[in-house]
Amino acid sequence: MIKGMKKLLSIIFLALMALPIMAQKNVYKFSVKDGNDHTVKLKDYKGKVLLIVNTATKCGFTPQYEALQKLYETYKNQGFVVLDFPCNQFGAQAPGSFRDIHAFCTSNYGTTFPQFAKVNVNGRNE
């Protein structure tokens, strides 16, 4: 019993020691490009509640923009922000330029939350 407890405590201790190593990269250390190719530092959003979304304008989930906008409007005065990152890597479902995507979202769903330049989200081997 005591031997098992020591082993368990050792595992927990090692896991806790690894947390700072795993947490060194946080969202505030990243910079991204907006639709005008300007660099935006995510540390500018520090203190806000962020919902970072990967979106597409030509897929079955495109109507999510309506719900995202409603969430944003409801909670933005309490520090909530939706950060929208379109991606064309999944079946080419986010075609067009940033301007095309932005115009589509604003005219069809009235989006006002920050929308960034298209990103690639797949890893090297995906």
Regions found by a protein language model. Give the residues of each.
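Short, flexible, glycine/charge-rich loop motifs used to bind or transfer phosphoryl groups or to couple energy/partner
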Residues: 16-20, 39-42, 71-73
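Local sequence-structure signature of Cys/Sec-based thiol-disulfide redox active-site neighborhoods
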Residues: 46-51
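Generic structural marker for isolated residues within well-ordered, non-membrane alpha-helices
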Residues: 10, 28-29, 102
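N-terminal "domain-start" segment that seeds a small globular fold
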Residues: 22-43, 126
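Amphipathic alpha-helical repeat scaffolds
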Residues: 34, 54-58
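Bacterial Sec-dependent N-terminal signal peptides
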Residues: 1-25
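Structural microenvironment flanking redox-active thiols in thiol-disulfide oxidoreductases
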Residues: 61-125
